[in-house]
From Swiss-Prot:
Taxonomic lineage from the root: Viruses, Duplodnaviria, Heunggongvirae, Uroviricota, Caudoviricetes
Gene expressing this chain: TUM
The protein, known as: SOS operon TUM protein
Family of the protein in this entry: Belongs to the dinI family.
Classification via InterPro entries: DinI-like_sf, DNA_damage-inducible_DinI-like
Annotated signal sequence range: none
Role of this protein: The TUM protein is responsible for UV induction of the 186 prophage. The other three proteins modulate TUM activity.
Pfam families: DinI
Native organism: Escherichia phage 186
GO biological process terms held by the UniProt record: SOS response
Length: 146
């Protein structure tokens, strides 16, 4: 089970690096990491006699990446909670930093409104939404940014 979970995590990382490479924002070190992960996954699958293939395909020139500019996290905090603007700004700053470390092209907005709410746009995979939920919870519970 651990090996399968590790493979799943490695595959997600490889997919993320492939996406960044296709967008042109990937560093050479990231490519090396991806190739090493692919080799490790392939080696493990060869030992189990599974068929395995990896295909990378960059979008054609002139075609924008599907999520580019459309990936957004909008958070509304209830104005009745009496949260000061400096706290809201610090929350947005920390949230942006942590989310963009995983989803680089994401735009994060935090504002006051009539009720608390979270809107996620452009995140099609459930695993992406779960990762965002986890980041949101971690940042909100972490006192260090306040």
């Amino acid at each position: 089970m651990d090996r399968e979970l590790n493979e799943h995590v490695m595959i997600e990382r490889v997919e993320m690096i492939a996406r960044l490479t296709a967008e042109g924002t990937c560093q050479e070190r990231d490519r090396e990491i991806a190739l090493n992960l692919i080799a490790e996954i392939a080696r493990g699958n060869l030992m189990k006699n599974n068929n395995f293939s990896v295909v990378f395909s960059a979008p054609p020139v002139g075609e924008t990446f599907a999520k580019e500019g459309k990936v957004k996290v909008n958070i509304t905090l209830d104005k009745d909670q009496k949260i000061g603007q400096p706290v809201i700004d610090a929350f947005q700053c920390e949230l942006t930093k942590r989310i963009q470390s995983v989803f680089p092209s994401t735009r994060v907005t935090v504002k006051k409104g009539s009720m608390t709410g979270v809107e996620l746009m452009g995140f099609d995979k459930d695993s992406d939404r779960e990762a965002l939920d986890s980041i949101l919870q971690e940042v909100w519970e972490d006192e260090s940014w306040r």
